[in-house]
Amino acid sequence: MSGSGAMLLGLLILVAMATSLDTREICWNHSECDDPSEWCCRMGSGHGSCQPVCRP
């Protein structure tokens, strides 16, 4: 019983980690942006949007 419970808990943690990774802002230096002053891109919804600053 405890074995399957631990496996379920592990699966829940894995899903939570995957979703938190998906909505996180991923930053790099303006290689993907039209404006060289913009360098922060949000990758959550599959396409990044360039922004001048990166919010935590």
UniProtKB/Swiss-Prot annotation:
Residues 1-23 form the signal peptide. It comes from Californiconus californicus. Disulfide bonds join C27-C41, C33-C50, C40-C54. Expressed by the venom duct. GO terms for molecular function: toxin activity. Probable neurotoxin. One of its GO terms (cellular component) is extracellular region. This is Conotoxin Cal6.41b. Its main location: secreted. Keywords: Disulfide bond, Knottin, Neurotoxin, Secreted, Signal, Toxin. It comes from the Eukaryota. The cysteine framework is VI/VII (C-C-CC-C-C). The presence of a 'disulfide through disulfide knot' structurally defines this protein as a knottin. It is found in: Secreted.
